Structures are given as structure tokens and as C-alpha cells.
Amino acid sequence: MAIQAPKGTKDLLPMDSYKWHYIEDKLKKLAAEYALKEIRTPAFEHTELFERGVGETTDVVQKEMYTFKDKGDRSITLKPEGTAPAARAFIENGLFNEALPIKMFYFTPVFRYENVQKGRLREHHQFGVEVFGSTEASVDAELIGLAMRAFKEFRIDNLELNINNIGCPECRKKYNDALREYFRESYDELCDTCKTRFERNPMRLLDCKNKKCKEIGKDAPVILDYVCDDCSNHFENLKTYLDSLNIKYKVNPYIVRGLDYYTKTVFEIINNDITVCGGGRYNGLIEQIGGKPTPAVGFGMGIERLILTLMENNIEIPKPKEMDIFIGSMGDNGKIEAFKLVNALRTKGLKAECDHMNKSVKAQMKYANKIDASYSMIIGDTEIEEKKANLKRMEDGQQFEVSLNNLDEIASMILK
């Protein structure tokens, strides 16, 4: 029996990679316009980073992480999200000594042991943005604007932006007390996970996926009634900045996000009832994992989810021309000459290919059609002797006589 890929993973095949290149190129261009610079962090980190940063009571840490002991008996985890590793890199490399704010983006694989379903894999890829060093609500609004603009760049219009303010540790104490009071009378009906969270982190009860727990929590107290003046002012400033960008939003007091590091601003972007992007502010994370107190804000966007959203909205990703020219050959001398010519034309910026399968001339031309070559040429003894050949435009069959000694002429005809 042939070995298959692990459940929840998916191969990116050569005929589909152009979709990813298109998305990554657009997002990189957009990131540059916002003065974001790329960061790359390891695929695995010390488990403690996520336990301290993401939160021990979260679903991610309790149920979804791929954790193992390495040969040095150290607990290692494949990263389930990108923010904590970026924060660790910020501290470890002394980026707090650089001019602030530090603005960064990344493309990264993330790993979560989840139930596999449409749009949800155990390995997926994320575009993430993080900004370290500013407390200003203008940065929150800027990143939300970037995320919304990204979807507009991909022609996805039917979006709903939900925002909330989940306060700071001080004002959350009062809110947690109110949540305990609310859920206490239904405690026996809660799932086992929520019973554990009831004392340690009652806000996580609002993030439970259990149907019964969701039903119990639908009339729970809202955080906006408990936030302190500083958090409230930050939220009002955020709304003012969003209004200045003409970004429509809905205040949803039940958005808490699934990670413990969030403070103040949290947001989600929805398309057809599916969350396609989410993020928020995390002013305490850097200190939690051993750094100097540093405010920060960021978001994550799943690439697989984005591609699925494009498909569901019937938005085609433009397919680039795969091959500029295919050079076929006749005989041993023709094969060597075609091989040399193909490699020479590649130095002129052309996507060029020749026969590597010893096919007949007819089969070579079928292959040229199959790989969608714009032009083709056949090289045999006659062409080698006369130093010229016919360049065929595949679209209409028109042929042009060209000199094999003038590569610039051939390249200019194909690229014009």
C-alpha cells in the first residue's frame, strides 16, 4: 500500500502553486506599502512559549498542539500560531532597542490537531502582521484597514467587520466575577472543559464550541459594561480612526478570540458566516514571556481559507503563461542544439523547454500544446546547417524565419 500524507495535511501541487504565488505577491506588495518588513521564525518552539503566551486554559494549548520531547528531553511544540514566536524573536534579538514601532509580516505554516473539515486543516499556512511598540488606537485601525484592503485587492466585497474591546487585566477582574456569577447557576450543565475554566479563566467559557455551553452563554454579561476609562477611550479612538477611513464595522461584545494574550481591541472579518481574518491588541504578551512591557497589535489570515473564499465567491486567480517557447528536435545533433538553445534563451528571461523524453516530433508538438507554450521551434540537421529555423506562434500557427545566431531577435519577438 502506498504511503499517504498524514490526515489534515495537503500537498501543494505544481499546477496549483501559481494561486499561492499570486496571493503571496499581492500581500507582500501591500505589506511594503504599510512599511512592514518580513520576519521568519522556526517551525517549532519551546512548549513553554505557548503555555505562557497563548494561555494554558485555551483550546489551542489544552487540545490542539503538536508537542513532543526531543532527544535532549526538552518539550518542543510545532507552532500553532505566529504571534508568540514573533514576540519571542522581538525579545531575544533586542528589537526593542530599534526605532519603534517595529512593523513586521510573515508567511508561516502553523499546526493544530483539529477536526478536519472544509477550510480547516491540521497544517495550514498563515499571513500574519505584528506591530510592536505603540499603544495608539491608530495602529489598530491601520492594521484593520490593511486586512480589509487585502480582501478588496482580491475582489472580495461581501465582508463584515466585527470589533470588540475585551479590556485590560484590571477591568477584566470585575468582568470575570460577573461571568462566574452568571454561569454558576448552570454550572452542572457545562462541559468538563468549561467547568475547569469556570474558576481559572471564565472568559474562555464564551469561546466554547459546545452547543449547550453556547446556548447557556448567549445572554452572558458583556465586557463593554465593565471596561475601565482607559480601555473605553481606546475603543472610542479606534472607532474614530475607522470612521476616518470609511470602514464600516459592527460592535460585537461577544468576540473574545481564542487566545489569552489579547487585550483591548479584538476583531474578526466575516465572509458568508465564516471568519476569514482575526486579530487584536496584546499589550501584555511581551512581558508574559520575559520581555520588557511592550504594547503590540496584530492579525492572522489563513491562506487556504483565503483561496477557498475566492472559489466560493467565483473569483478566478489569473493563471500566468506557463511557457514562452518549446524547442523540439530531430536526431541526436538536433537534440543537443535544442538543449543549448533552450538554456541560452533562459538567460534572456524566457521560460523555455525542450524534449527530455525522446518523443517523436508529432508527440513533441502535442506536448508543446499541453504545456501552453506561446511559441515553438523544431531543430534538426537542416536548421543547424543553415543557422536558421522557423519560429511558430502557437495561437494562430503563423511562422517567422529567425537566425539561430541572433538570440536577442528571438527573445524580442517572443516577449513583445
Swiss-Prot record:
Domain of life: Bacteria
Entries under Pfam families matching the protein: HGTP_anticodon (PF03129), tRNA-synt_His (PF13393)
Alphabetized GO MF terms: ATP binding; catalytic activity, acting on a protein; histidine-tRNA ligase activity; transferase activity
Catalytic activity: tRNA(His) + L-histidine + ATP = L-histidyl-tRNA(His) + AMP + diphosphate + H(+)
Key words of the record: Aminoacyl-tRNA synthetase, ATP-binding, Cytoplasm, Ligase, Nucleotide-binding, Protein biosynthesis
BP GO annotations: histidyl-tRNA aminoacylation
Subunit structure of this chain's protein: Homodimer.
Name this polypeptide is given: Histidine--tRNA ligase
Species per Swiss-Prot/TrEMBL record: Clostridium novyi (strain NT)
